[in-house]
């Protein structure tokens, strides 16, 4: 039986976070009443003329710069001709022979192994509308609110060899476009979705096998499962001596199967030609330099710097850079306190509070707690004003109210007892109340020290300085 390897390429559709559509002034707001964000241009009325959105061109260029692409100073819009009810003009405005960006790459890591995935091209295009199939009715409706929304399609080289590599590539790309602020990243609303081209070939073969395209995968989990499912389907066909048919397939997440949708089109089927209504897009040298200067530090570079700052494992630091807002929050707090301790508070109690309260961990701007408050919490623990246990106990209140920690602990009477004479009284009382445990401790059961510490902490309502308690106990029990 032959051993096969997968050949996978992704076509990722990124909805650009512009206020208006690609060729008209209609808003791109999601969730509006059907056909309310529509005009003559995006509804494909004869005689209407498209005007390119400058912000979309800017955003597309930023994506190209962030992925190491060559930016073409001159690019051309083309008409992609096909019929579908949600495509009112009978063609999609896309780019073909001369896209805005070409020849980029993304470096991914899977199981500690780094790999470079090439990016063939990035081109701009307008989105189609949406067909709504009424349940129980023999009728379909068309909502054109989405028609004309600006997209960039990021086409990878067929360099991935497993579903895990495809997901790693997709997650890295997602991090980049959300860091850049060019996409809101809402996969449920279709802002970031992909098509996967999957084929199998014998290991060591140079030629590609027959590929199938899996359409409109809108979650990382579904991408992983759909590719694995399709690989298994093709493997079964080839093992049985059958041929894989080139076609477009849909993934059914409930049944975990892929089903045939239609035969796969080639580029010539769309009869591309330059759009006669739109002049070539030209990017000036001054615009290019200005946009290059706008590029933020990207997630991988920032993660590497945070590892150096904190000494934490890369896997933990990756959580801190999962969104630009979260990374900015950490950077602000770390600049005012011990970076590693600030990171530990964020990775522990802070994310715990986000999860328990259903708060978006990627959007610190919506939190009541500010970076200055987290930094102050780190500092007052370091100064001995409160113990780390108290800090963890009060974190929920601090997160909810946004009050500064030092003020909070003083108002609540939670300041740590670090006066040895005051603590000595509590230590003596606990020793006097537990003679059997004292005798056992002195007889060699030294683990009982934690029992004594616990009793003292209970007596002082958690306010005793643990280090000083241990020191006093060691002296009095010896």
From Swiss-Prot:
- List the InterPro entries hit by this protein, alphabetically: Asn/Gln-tRNA_amidoTrfase_suB/E (IPR017959), Asn/Gln-tRNA_Trfase_suB/E_cat (IPR006075), Asn/Gln_amidotransferase (IPR018027), Asn/Gln_tRNA_amidoTrase-B-like (IPR003789), GatB (IPR004413), GatB_C_1 (IPR042114), GatB_Yqey_C_2 (IPR023168), Gln-tRNA_amidoTrfase_suB_CS (IPR017958)
Keyword Transferase listed: no
Q: How does it assemble?
A: Heterotrimer of A, B and C subunits.
Catalyzed reaction equations: L-glutamyl-tRNA(Gln) + L-glutamine + ATP + H2O = L-glutaminyl-tRNA(Gln) + L-glutamate + ADP + phosphate + H(+); L-aspartyl-tRNA(Asn) + L-glutamine + ATP + H2O = L-asparaginyl-tRNA(Asn) + L-glutamate + ADP + phosphate + 2 H(+)
- Source organism superkingdom: Bacteria
Its gene name is: gatB
| Keywords, sorted A to Z | ATP-binding, Ligase, Nucleotide-binding, Protein biosynthesis
- What Enzyme Commission number(s) appear in the record? 6.3.5.-
Q: Please report the name of this protein according to its UniProt entry.
A: Aspartyl/glutamyl-tRNA(Asn/Gln) amidotransferase subunit B
Per the record, the similarity remark reads: Belongs to the GatB/GatE family. GatB subfamily.
Q: Which GO terms describe its molecular function?
A: asparaginyl-tRNA synthase (glutamine-hydrolyzing) activity; ATP binding; glutaminyl-tRNA synthase (glutamine-hydrolyzing) activity
This chain's function reads:
Allows the formation of correctly charged Asn-tRNA(Asn) or Gln-tRNA(Gln) through the transamidation of misacylated Asp-tRNA(Asn) or Glu-tRNA(Gln) in organisms which lack either or both of asparaginyl-tRNA or glutaminyl-tRNA synthetases. The reaction takes place in the presence of glutamine and ATP through an activated phospho-Asp-tRNA(Asn) or phospho-Glu-tRNA(Gln).
Asked whether the UniProt record includes Transmembrane among its keywords, one would answer no
Please cite one Gene Ontology biological process associated with this protein.
translation
List the Pfam families hit by this protein, alphabetically.
GatB_N, GatB_Yqey
The organism is Desulfovibrio desulfuricans (strain ATCC 27774 / DSM 6949 / MB)
């Amino acid at each position: 039986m032959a051993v096969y390897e997968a050949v996978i390429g992704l076509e990722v559709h990124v909805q650009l976070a512009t206020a208006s559509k690609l060729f008209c002034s209609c808003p791109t707001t999601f969730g509006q009443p059907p056909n309310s964000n529509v005009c003559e241009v995006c509804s494909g009325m004869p005689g209407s003329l498209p005007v390119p959105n400058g912000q979309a061109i800017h955003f597309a260029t930023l994506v190209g710069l962030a992925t190491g692409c060559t930016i073409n100073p001159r690019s051309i819009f083309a008409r992609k001709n096909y019929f579908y009810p949600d495509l009112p003009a009978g063609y999609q405005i896309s780019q073909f022979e001369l896209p805005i960006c070409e020849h980029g790459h993304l470096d991914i890591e899977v199981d500690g192994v780094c790999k470079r995935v090439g990016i063939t091209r990035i081109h701009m295009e307008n989105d189609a509308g949406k067909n709504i199939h009424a349940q129980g009715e023999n009728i379909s409706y068309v909502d054109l609110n989405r028609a004309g929304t600006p997209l960039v399609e990021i086409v990878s080289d067929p360099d991935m060899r497993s579903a895990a590599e495809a997901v790693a590539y997709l997650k890295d790309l997602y991090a980049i476009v959300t860091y850049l602020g060019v996409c809101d990243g809402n996969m449920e609303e279709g802002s970031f979705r992909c098509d996967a081209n999957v084929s199998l070939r014998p290991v060591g073969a140079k030629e590609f096998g027959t590929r199938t395209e899996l359409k409109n995968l809108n979650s990382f989990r579904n991408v992983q499962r759909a590719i694995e499912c399709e690989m298994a389907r093709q493997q079964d066909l080839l093992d049985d001596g059958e041929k894989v048919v080139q076609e477009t397939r849909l993934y059914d997440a409930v049944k975990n199967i892929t089903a045939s949708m239609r035969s796969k089109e080639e580029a010539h089927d769309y009869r591309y030609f330059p759009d006669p209504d739109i002049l070539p897009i030209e990017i000036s040298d001054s615009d290019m330099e200005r946009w290059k200067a706008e590029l933020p530090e990207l997630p991988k570079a920032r993660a590497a710097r945070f590892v150096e700052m904190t000494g934490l494992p890369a896997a933990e630091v990756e959580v801190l850079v999962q969104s630009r807002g979260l990374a900015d929050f950490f950077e602000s707090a770390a600049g005012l306190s011990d970076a590693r301790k600030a990171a530990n508070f964020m990775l522990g109690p802070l994310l715990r509070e986000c999860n328990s309260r259903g708060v978006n961990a990627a959007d610190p701007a919506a939190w009541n707690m500010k970076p200055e408050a987290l930094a102050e919490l780190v500092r007052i623990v370091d100064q001995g004003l409160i113990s780390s246990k108290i800090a963890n106990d009060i974190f929920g209140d601090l997160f909810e109210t946004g009050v500064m920690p030092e003020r909070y602990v003083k108002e609540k009477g939670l300041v740590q007892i670090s006066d040895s004479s005051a603590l000595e009284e509590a230590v003596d009382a606990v020793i006097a109340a537990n003679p059997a445990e004292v005798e056992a401790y002195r007889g060699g059961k030294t683990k009982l020290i934690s029992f004594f510490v616990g009793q003292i902490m209970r007596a002082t309502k958690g306010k005793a300085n643990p280090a000083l308690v241990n020191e006093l106990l060691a002296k009095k029990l010896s």
